[in-house]
Amino acid sequence: MESKTVDPTEFRGAQREQWDTAATGWRKWSEVIDQAAGPASERLVELAGVEPGSRVLDVAAGYGEPSLTAAKQAGEDGSVVATDISAEMLAYGRERAAAAGLENLEFIESDAISLDFPEDSFDAALSRWGIIFDPDGEGAAARVRGFLKPGGRFAIASWGPPDKVPMLGVPMVTAMKRLDIPPPPPGTPGPLSRPTPEAIGGLLQGGGFSDVKVEEIALTMDYPSAEEFTTFVREIAPPITALLAPHPQDVQDETWAAITEAAREHASEDGSLRLENQALLAVGKA
């Protein structure tokens, strides 16, 4: 069901601009992200049933995950089509694929709802924290289902609730309190928009998928200091930077300082942070 809280065209345009801007940060932090999120990519590929020779679609692939993981599993007889709304993120994905020596990937710039492939084009589909950003997640899932062969599986990821995802919850809750921003209405797309098994499983069910299953996975992210954590968030997380953007620079600076202090509450004696984050993985059959 398309979100009633945002204008879809406006929202997707803002997403494109924000993620194009964030691509520089993803280049800088990709190793940190890969180390933490790699297990999610591997499990999604497994849940989707990707095997040698598989034809795979990755929706909202960003910088190329889980596309690259899937491409390695599909092998030279398989293929992966990685799609994303951001040209800059895809450009980095192409570079990463080339550096990994993977020649079985194709990158296409498109939002999820506009994808168009013939029926039975793919054996499996994936989306790691991607389709949850679409204003019409169920509609996008239905389109993906139409591209899959009968019985093909679509495996997707979302984040849990803010208190179980400190990487996002700490900065987002701090910023919203500091700036007196009310919680977004239910159905507003974003990283924390599908925080329960019912919500993320419902996206697939709403898209017509059957035999939907949901599981949890814990992903740990390490930072040498609270300051480094704040820098990380500023450079890779458009949903949070967008909260601050409308405010004067001094207010933004004060809010980032408050985020650093909130993060410091999670620090160990040496000042470093180890944040365990709950992700939800869902899979359904076409």
Region roles according to the model:
Residues I113-A124:
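A short acidic, Gly/Pro-enriched loop at the edge of an enzyme's catalytic core
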Residues E138-G139, R145, K149-P224:
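Conserved catalytic/acceptor-binding region of the Class I
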